[in-house]
Amino acid sequence: GKSMPTIIAKCCHDLDLIVWLMNKKCSTISSFGKLFWFRPENAPEGSAEHCCDCSEEVKEKCLYNAYKIYPERMKRAVVGGLARFKGRDIYEILAEKKDKVSKCVYHSDNDAIDNQVVNMEFEDGSNANLTMTAFSQECYRVTHVHGTKGEVFGNSEDGLVHVNIYGEEEKIVDVNKE
């Protein structure tokens, strides 16, 4: 992005969590990412600069059509991004063409990367990786920690943390009730 690296803007808390869980210093890091897909040459044929100006046929074919994506996401918006529109009709916002959410992801002036991987090696030889991607059916965080004695995984959507100690029955913790 123009103001800061996307990985910091979108994943600083994820990186903090990794460092906290590892409880040691990162000794080596590698990272790769780029604006791979959301470029004009990958736009659906006949697409317009704003989703509201696309034909019904293009809207139907386009996986990233704002009219498909935003109404459902508006219901879950809590902070940032779409939350600033709470109480407003998303269809009116898209038709106004005043906000970047109405702009076609392929034709926008966005320079933020759409995918990135970060690999970290820690001082004892253990490692961790982080994948940030725009290419997911659901837009929420998924955390999966693999250890020598078990694994822990969960996501930011349902508030459930699955704890699997190898050889034992899975324990599910509902963080909303704990």
Describe the role of every protein-language-model region:
Residues 32, 36-38, 85, 91, ...:
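Phenylalanine-focused residue identity feature
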Residues 112-178:
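C-terminal helical cap and adjacent loop that interface with cofactors, partners, or active-site loops
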Residues 80-86, 92-97, 107-112, 117-120, ...:
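Generic detector of short, locally flexible boundary/turn motifs and exposed helical patches
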Residues 6-9, 106-110, 133-134:
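Short Gly/Pro-enriched turn/cap motifs at secondary-structure boundaries
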Residues 14-16, 53, 89, 99, ...:
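Acidic-enriched, low-complexity/disordered segments with a strong bias for Aspartate over Glutamate
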Residues 1-103:
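Predominantly a Rossmann-like dinucleotide-binding segment in NAD(P)-dependent oxidoreductases
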